[in-house]
Amino acid sequence: MSVFCNQIRASSALVRRLKHALFLTQTARSFTTMEGHRPTIVHKRSLDILHDPWFNKGTAFSMTERDRLDLRGLLPPNIMSSDQQIERFMFDLKRLEEQAKDGPSDPNALAKWRILNRLHDRNETMYYKVLIAHIEEYAPIVYTPTVGLVCQNYSGLFRRPRGMYFSAADRGEMMSMVYNWPAEQVDMIVVTDGSRILGLGDLGVQGIGIAIGKLDLYVAAAGINPQRVLPVMIDVGTNNDKLLNDPLYLGLQQDRLDGDEYIAVIDEFMEAVFTRWPHVIVQFEDFQSKWAFKLLQRYRNTYRMFNDDVQGTAGVAIAGLLGAVRAQGRPMIDFPKQKIVVAGAGSAGIGVLNAARKTMARMLGNNEIAFESARSQFWVVDAKGLITEDRDNIDAEAQPFARKVKEANRQGLREGSSLIEVVQQVKPDVLLGLSAVGGLFSKEVLEALKGSTSTRPAIFAMSNPTTNAECTPEDAFSVVGDNIIFASGSPFTDVDLGNGHIGHSNQGNNMYLFPGIGLGTLLSGSRMISDGMLQAAAECLAAYMTEDEVVEGIIYPPISRIRDITKEVAAAVVQEAIEEDLAEGYREMDARELRRLDEEEIKEYVKNNMWTPEYPTLVYKKA
């Protein structure tokens, strides 16, 4: 009888799961992969539809659609499949690559960007189909490192507007001008003020290129619907003399606003976008350090927002640091024993320090003693050298990591000790670069790291773009030795160590986390993005690699797996939002239904809500 009852219970559970799967399929609505199989209502026809990248299919329009949308005679008669269209496009792109393969890399990369951008301008579905299929090859073109070149040259490259521009000249008008954007629903905004683009400094209005590139990855990696993303530039002027004196510069040619005037512009923008789209998520990108933390603290408990430079970079670094512990053959719980020298005390560096300290403290008991013990594991060096309590006018954000004078003296160090001296005396397990100073990890610094007490020291040259990386993998492996872990922010190729072994060059890029953080927040309906959700994302990424991969020195997965990685990270974020009672649900999946999902069902829920680039059937309806 008990066996029979068990069978009945199992059958009931199976029925419940099947019903739930049916529920997910029925309720995922237009944001699911079913979207492309349901008709889409459009309010334009003829040339207007061909000039709209959201709906244009080019030669893939069927004859019935051509008749329905007044397109007959406006296109060549041969109807091509999307695969045939991509084949034609890739032929042109590969021909360019063949012609330019022996030329300088920067012009070649910009030429690829131009070709991809032209496709983006005329046919978004095909653009994202190409990007997803070739993500490992083209992510470095639409995002780092090429996006840095794009931003530097944006005024000359500009052909067609993408996104919105809010400026100091628009004060008092933002609440109305936000309705100029045609999309009724926006799920994701990436906003920058152009003040600190990658490691390139103040690029003013040209910084919008980074917001566009980030959102390309939200679509390609996270499956956010491209019709529901919005890149934004807040132009408050620039302090870049070259741009101020350039007659072709597209932005405001005035000194950058500061203080209360600056805050007033950002406040007005935030109020405007959240008034029109109350559930939008806003990612702050490449704001200078002096404002990055202040704006994060100002808005994070009121709006659904996060700062990728502070929180995203920190999460990716934490995942890599935990992976480095695993690569040493130790459990992740040993992370609090790692001695870490950090080069760079800007927004990214401090963000990583805060996150690493919290992670260590949580492993040690999450009390005051644990936080103090965690603090003692970090030695922070900036442009003036080692930061100690003897430093005058220490930034408030860096203050918690200033070494006590006696601690420094016991280590044979002092206020302002050089990076070489600190590495020599501390003998760290990890050398972490977030300085935006290319080549900072010189041969002398790397030689000093050979004295590390670690069985397998780790070098993180995390600054972007490539020219700002603190060192190359070739430098690291050739100077320190084969038995190291190497990671960088921009892509580098693996190193042939000449003994049948490969020195793996891990790319610790923020794109492993920010798409999943955004998607998980969206699908959970979380009221805010908590530290716990960010921690869950980082730990998910750290655990993604297998033991065999980690032992080989691979601590970050290949970019080719980015859709699967993002699904896992988003599911972890959803789960954490549920556990923290922050989740309010998404569309028909209300908070109560969300709480009923188990781990695998959450992953399925995430997967079903990732947009895929397929042409929908278009049906005209008069507006």
Where are the regions that the model predicts?
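N-terminal ligand-binding/catalytic initiation module
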Residues: 32-304, 576, 603, 608-623
